Amino acid sequence: LSICRKALTRYMPELVPTWERLGHLAGGNVRVARMLSLYCPAPYVVGCSQAVWTGSEPLLVRNYDYHPDAFEGVAVHTQWNDTRVMGVSDCLWGLLDGMNEHGLVAALAFGGRRDGGVGFGIPLILRYVLETCHTVDEAAAVLDRVPSHMSYNVLLTDRTGDHAVVAVAPDRSTTVERRAFCTNHQDGTGWARYLEVTRSFERERRLESLMGDPAMTSAELIRSFLKDPLYSKEHARGFGTLYTTVYRPRAGRMSCLWPDRSVDQDFDDYEPQEIEVETPDSPTDSQAESRPSESA
């Protein structure tokens, strides 16, 4: 526990009081506190497509592709450190994607590389970014400073329309590119079997085509995320699309989308609610064998 505390204090000191409060709420259990630090966690692999619309009203749209049994299925609205944040939760207090009241938006995608190292789970780093930063440049600086335990692509935008893809990894330097979209690989390389199964390059080509179309509208871009190849139906293999989110930083509005429904929330009128979304059955043993594994 002392190692986790030291790492949090060094890299994300503003989160330490909240971490301590959460540990207290959990009864002071040491194992729970260590888990909540997300320091050097077990590897986890997701598939995502995400893009920033840079038109008159900037927005970020993304799909989250993962195993339904490992998904918390919780969207949250918090104000833990004087900043209101809303997004989709992971690891109890981390975020898969989210936006703060200053108009900064961040979303993660696995970077397609198996190499692991010493660092934090990316959901907690995203939480920290949205708790402490106002702009894309500030967020990129934090992502460069705080070590990630695996490779991820983080897409950022803010209410000015500035945007960037920040590629983090435990074994090489962080890169920042002024690109408006990303999927699940870095530098055109990575874990070959995973990239094949998740169609990362195909999804990237589709995003490049959409973003390069001068007639494209934001509404059409969003609809494209509910269609093949960006929308994945590979739930039986653990990489199906579980939700689509759209963040509009100027309006302070978040939308969660599925093919048959949507839920809209905003900072000033966030309404807790519970909905039921049907996803295909979990993978069978034989289907799970077709997924890329750590030994693949």
Predicted regions and their residues:
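C-terminal, well-structured catalytic/ligand-binding subdomain of enzymes
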Residues: 1-31, 37-39, 54-296
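Charged, often glycine-rich, active-site loop that binds/positions anionic groups
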Residues: 41-52
